[in-house]
Amino acid sequence: MRAPVLKELDLPQYKQSLRKAVKFLNELEYTAVKTKYNAKGNWDAVSIRGYSDDITNILKPGVLKSNVKVEPLRWTRLYEEPDLLPLKEILSHIPAEFERVRVMRLKAGTTIKKHTDKVDKAIKDGKIVRLHIPIKTSMNV
C-alpha cells in the first residue's frame, strides 16, 4: 500500500528569536555539499544527525562514491548545543523518525536547481520525506 504524500505539516509557528542559533551556526566550519548542483561551492552544511559524530560528515553511505561507513545513525554534539535549543524544539514537533538532519547554507544571491536525491529511493513510496525549514531566508525564496 502506498503511503499518502503530505505536502504540508500542521506545525506550531516558532515565534522565539533564532539570533543566538544563527550566530552559533555562523561560527561553525561547514562542509561543501557534494553534488553537481554545487559546482561553484555556494552550498554547504553541517550535521545534526547522521552516520558519524563528526558534524562535517554530511553524507549518507553509498552517496556519490563517498567513503562514509555504514554506521548506526546518531545525533551529533550540535543536538545538545544550548544555543541550538530552538532547532531541537522545532524538530520535536515533527511526527517522524529522523535519518539525517543537517543545517544547510546557500550563499546569498545563489540558487539550487530542482533535483532529487536518487539514493533515497523510499521517497517515492512515502517512507522517507525531505523537509526544508528555513532558519534565515529572504523574501525572494
Language-model region placement:
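Non-heme Fe(II)/2-oxoglutarate
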Residues: 1-93
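Catalytic core of non-heme Fe(II) oxygenases with the double-stranded beta-helix
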Residues: 87-141
